[in-house]
C-alpha cells in the first residue's frame, strides 16, 4: 500500500492511494496562492496599477525539471471531501486521460460548481490585450525575484479552465450520501462520513474485509451550520491520513467573529465603508447570521449589506434547500416552516441585497456607508479590485480579511500606499492541534500519516510545541512529490467456498477445540472476489480420434500427499527405537529441538518443532524403516 503526495499545501491536498490494485485520488485542491505573484485585474484600466515598476534581475537557483510522480490516467476513482478541494478537477479530468469516476456529495458538487463558475467569470470578463508567457522560460525564470524564481514547475502552470471544461468535469461526478457504501471493483469499499466543516463536506473510509484506511480532511468539531462530524466510524483504523487542519491555530473562531462585528460597527458609525473579501459560500453564511443578530443591537439596521458575486443568488438559495445536510437545529426550522438561515429574512427586509456584478442594478441602488461582501479573497481579480481602488484612499474605510487562505500583507502589496484601515480576522473552523490530539486518542488508529508541516511547530513560532501533532506512535510525515509506503501489510483475504465443496470436507481434531481439514479445489477469481469450487472430475477416456475443444482441457488435479501434524515425544520415540532393535542411542538437546544419534547404525535424526530429518549413509531401507516409526507419532489429514 502506497501514498503519493502531489500537493505541497496541507489544506488543499491531493494524494493518491494505491490499495488492493485500486488507485484512488484523495481530493484535488488548487493552490491559488501563486496568484499573489501577479498584478490585480481591474475592471477598468488602472493608470496606477499599469505604472507599477516591473521586476529587477536577481541571481536565482537553477530551474528544476518537471518529474512525473504518477500517471494520472491510471487513477480509477477520485474522492472529494469538500468544495474547496475540487477546484483542480477540470485540469485532471480533461487533460490527463482520466477515465474513472468521481464521488462527492450533492452540496459539494453544487457549491463547487458555483466557486468554479465565479472563478471563470472573474477571469474571462477582464480580457487582457496581451498575454505574457516569456517568464515561463527556464533561463528567464531563474532571473526573476523570489518567490517566482523558487516556484516549483512554473513551466507547467496553466491558464484558468473554461465553463465548458467545468461542465465536462462535473458530469463525471457520481453523487453519494453520508454513510453510503460504494464498492470499487469488488476490491475495496469507500464510505463518506460527515466532517462537520462545510455543507456536504466528507471524510472517507476506505476498507477491505481486513484493512481499514480513514481519510480525514477539512473537519470541524464546532457547532456551525453543517451536520456534526462523525467520529465513531473512524475507530479501528489501520491507517489514518490527516489533512486540512486549521491554518491559524492560534486564532479562536468565536473571538474572530466578535472582532469582525465590532470593527465593522466602528467603521460604519464613523461614516466609512467596510469591504469583506470572501468566497461566495461557507463562512459568509455564518457572518451574515452573526450580523443578523448584531446589527439591531448595535444600531446599524439602516446600513445596507451588499453581496456581489456572479453566483450570489444561487449560493444564497442553495444554502436554504440543502436541509438534510444541515445541523439538527437548522433542519428543525424547515418543518416549522422557517428558512434555516436568517439571511433569508435580511433579504426580505431589504437589509441584504445581492447582485451578479457592480454593473446595472447595483449602480442604481448603491448608497454609503455600506458593507460589501465580494470576491476574490486574493484581491487579484473580481469586483474586490474595483472597491480596493475606490475606497483605498480614505482612512474612514476598512477592509476586513476573514479568509485564511492568503497572506493579507501580500494581498495588499499592489495597493500600497493604502489609507484605508486593514483588519485581519481570519475565521477557520477546521480542527486545531488540541482537538486533533483528543480525536486521535478517541479513535486510536494504529498509524497516523500527515503532511510534514503538522509534525513540527510553525517556523514563526518554533517554541510552540503545542502547535504540532502529538500522538503515539509518532505520525509519519510526507512532503510534496514523495511516495510513502504505508506501514502495514495485508495478511488475509476473504474467500468463499461452495456448499458442495464444504460438505465434502472432513475436519480432524489436532488439538482440543482445534480441527483442520485439507481442501483440494479450484480457485476462481473475478472482480476481486474469490471462490473455491470443487475440483473437476477426471475426464473419461474417449474412443475414436475426435478432437477435443480447448474448453475441455481442464487440468488434472494431482493426488496430494497427506499433511502431518503433531509433535514427537523424544523419550517415547527412543523407547520405540529400542523395541525395534536399535541400540546405543544418544539424545542431544539443541536450540531448536533434539538430535537422536544411532551410533551403531551411523544415523542421525533431527527433531525440531516444525520438521524432522533422517540423515543416514545411502541406506534407503533403514531410512524408510525409521520414517515409519516417526509417522506413528504424527496425525495424518
UniProtKB/Swiss-Prot annotation:
A motif (Nuclear localization signal) lies at residues 545-549. GO terms for biological process: RNA polymerase II transcription initiation surveillance; snRNA 3'-end processing. Keywords: Cytoplasm, Isopeptide bond, Nucleus, Ubl conjugation. It comes from the Eukaryota. GO terms for cellular component: cytoplasm; INTAC complex; integrator complex; nucleus. There is a cross-link at residue 58 (Glycyl lysine isopeptide (Lys-Gly) (interchain with G-Cter in SUMO2)). Its main location: nucleus. SUPFAM superfamilies: Metallo-hydrolase/oxidoreductase. It is found in: Nucleus; Cytoplasm. InterPro entries: Beta_Casp, Integrator_9su, IntS9-like_C, Metallo-B-lactamas, RibonucZ/Hydroxyglut_hydro. The keyword Cytoplasm applies. The keyword Ubl conjugation applies. Residues 527-553 are annotated as: Disordered. Belongs to the metallo-beta-lactamase superfamily. RNA-metabolizing metallo-beta-lactamase-like family. INTS9 subfamily. Component of the integrator complex, a multiprotein complex that terminates RNA polymerase II (Pol II) transcription in the promoter-proximal region of genes. Component of the Integrator complex, composed of core subunits INTS1, INTS2, INTS3, INTS4, INTS5, INTS6, INTS7, INTS8, INTS9/RC74, INTS10, INTS11/CPSF3L, INTS12, INTS13, INTS14 and INTS15. The core complex associates with protein phosphatase 2A subunits PPP2CA and PPP2R1A, to form the Integrator-PP2A (INTAC) complex. INTS9 is part of the RNA endonuclease subcomplex, composed of INTS4, INTS9, INTS11 and inositol hexakisphosphate (InsP6). Interacts with WDR73; interaction is required for the assembly of the RNA endonuclease subcomplex in the cytoplasm. Although strongly related to RNA-specific endonuclease proteins, it lacks the HXHXDH motif that binds zinc and participates in the catalytic center. Its function as endonuclease is therefore unsure. This is Integrator complex subunit 9. It comes from Macaca fascicularis (Crab-eating macaque). The lineage of its organism: Eukaryota, Metazoa, Chordata, Craniata, Vertebrata. The gene is INTS9.
